[in-house]
Amino acid sequence: MFSPRSIRHCRACGAPTAYREPPDDNRERAICSACGTIHYENPINVVGTVPVFEGKVLLCLRNIEPRRGFWTLPAGFMELNETTEQGAVRETVEEAGAKIVLGPLLTLLNVPHVGQVHLYYRAEMTSAALDPGPETIEARLFDESEIPWDELAFKTVKVTLERFFADRRRGQFAVHCADIA
């Protein structure tokens, strides 16, 4: 189970915190020793897309750790003051320079061992033009038969692509929820 215990000082006053269970709660939280502020640690949202152009799926070769040199869908951490949809579009532009029309949600994947929830949306690219950003070594379109399955960066990417291609073959897309160990 993911347990970072990373809050050492209060964000409100700067005093040290201690982990203990607040009254009427059922788990330990970082509590300020001076002002009593309770700090909650919650999962981080990762948002991304499955961009498609003329039947091919866009993948990005990672230029950052973790998993530098492995292929991924364009995705990243959601920022404050943006929706999941806005974050997915932003990450697609930042990582691949792809212009897209966002479609519906495809996968919602719980990744509790790293404290994350991943949301991937289907997307149609408006052109094949790509302009990868600094986090990407290369961005490229792949037919299903060309997907480098053994070189994918994360299990969430593999699961999302498997669901996408299965739905596409069936001719009907659904929203898929899964827990990733």
Residue ranges: model-predicted function:
Residues E28, E54-K56, A128:
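Beta-strand-connecting loop/turn residues
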Residues R5, R27, I44, V52, ...:
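A generic fold-level signal
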Residues F2-G48:
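Acidic, metal-coordinating catalytic segment for phosphate/diphosphate chemistry
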Residues P51-V52, L59, A123, L141:
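Conserved hydrophobic "DFG−1" position in protein kinase catalytic cores
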Residues M78-V101, L105-R163, D167, G171-A174, ...:
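Unchanged
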Residues A34, R62, A75, A123, ...:
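Active-site donor-binding loop signature of nucleotide-sugar glycosyltransferases
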